[in-house]
A protein has these predicted regions:
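Extended acidic low-complexity intrinsically disordered regions
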Residues: 1-7
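Short, surface-exposed, charged amphipathic helix/loop patches that serve as local interaction elements
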Residues: 7-9, 17-106
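Short aromatic-centered micro-motifs
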Residues: 14
Length: 106
């Protein structure tokens, strides 16, 4: 299925079944809603992964549906890659590029 992409998508690319999808940073509203579950991420929480992917992809592909993501686009093998891609795009993963809080840098 083909979805229209916004003119200037932002985020991180991830190739799924031969197609490049651009996973955008989560909006504040989506992050706020999902934060309690994001703090204790369990890879077997497939509903959370579908919600995260939907919140991300909806920003770059306005016509995409959660059902398409959960039922057709993603499979169990994509769980970690999708989660890491979205969290990285959203700035919710420490990358080692900047000192962590409390790190004196000495």
């Amino acid at each position: 299925m083909q979805f229209n992409q916004v003119e200037n998508p932002r985020g991180n690319p991830l190739k799924i079944d031969g197609q490049i999808w651009i996973f955008a940073p989560l909006s504040l509203g989506v992050a706020e809603k999902l934060m309690p579950k994001l703090k204790t991420f369990d890879p077997s929480d497939f509903a959370l992964v579908a919600d995260v992917a939907y919140g991300s992809l909806k920003r770059n592909y306005p016509d995409i549906t959660r059902d398409f993501i959960a039922d057709e686009l993603l499979d169990v093998g994509h769980v970690n890659d999708v989660f890491e891609t979205v969290m990285g795009a959203s700035g919710l993963v420490y990358t080692g590029d900047e000192p962590q809080e409390g790190d004196s840098g000495e």
